[in-house]
Amino acid sequence: MSCRKPANYRYGEHTADVLVQAFGCTLEEAFKNAAVALADLTYYSERVEPRMAKKVEVEYDDLEGLLFKWIDELLFLFDAEKFAWGRNIEVELRQGVGYRISATLHGEMYDINKHGFTGLIVKAMTFHMMEIKKVDDYWVLQYVVDI
């Protein structure tokens, strides 16, 4: 599917935090790009090889809560398990009573010598300035993380 999204993601200026805007032709693609943007804040995701896979499932009543839980779960994967995911991410989003993401992230254990370090450590996800909207033919997921 082709659309006129401006990029996969971009960062914005924000004091002591980082504002992230992730884009996608579909909500699934936007959630995937939100995960890649999060990774690229700390390490270089293009250096990650798909040596193992991690399943992630999150659900919430609304899309904003789902985005919060998605990013929060990914932070846990990196902080607690030292799992570095690359750009190969499969995301399935389902809507029923609420919303549910079932995803598979391909990656490997984080190695600073291989994956590098950008100098930023993401501490937490916030609800500050969170926004999810459809613009023309693409989706925008905006969120802020504490660094």
UniProtKB/Swiss-Prot annotation:
GO MF: calcium ion binding
SUPFAM superfamilies (UniProt xref): MTH1598-like
Keywords of this entry: Calcium, Metal-binding, tRNA processing
Pfam family membership, one: Archease
Protein name (database record): Protein archease
Protein role: Activates the tRNA-splicing ligase complex by facilitating the enzymatic turnover of catalytic subunit RtcB. Acts by promoting the guanylylation of RtcB, a key intermediate step in tRNA ligation. Can also alter the NTP specificity of RtcB such that ATP, dGTP or ITP is used efficiently.
HAMAP family the UniProt entry points to: Archease_arch
GO terms under biological process: tRNA splicing, via endonucleolytic cleavage and ligation
UniProt binding sites for Ca(2+): D17, D146, I147
Claim: Metal-binding is one of the keywords in the record: yes
InterPro entries, per the entry: Archease (IPR002804), Archease_arc (IPR022952), Archease_dom (IPR023572), Archease_dom_sf (IPR036820)
Similarity section: Belongs to the archease family.
Signal peptide start-end: none
The keyword Metal-binding is annotated on this UniProt entry: yes
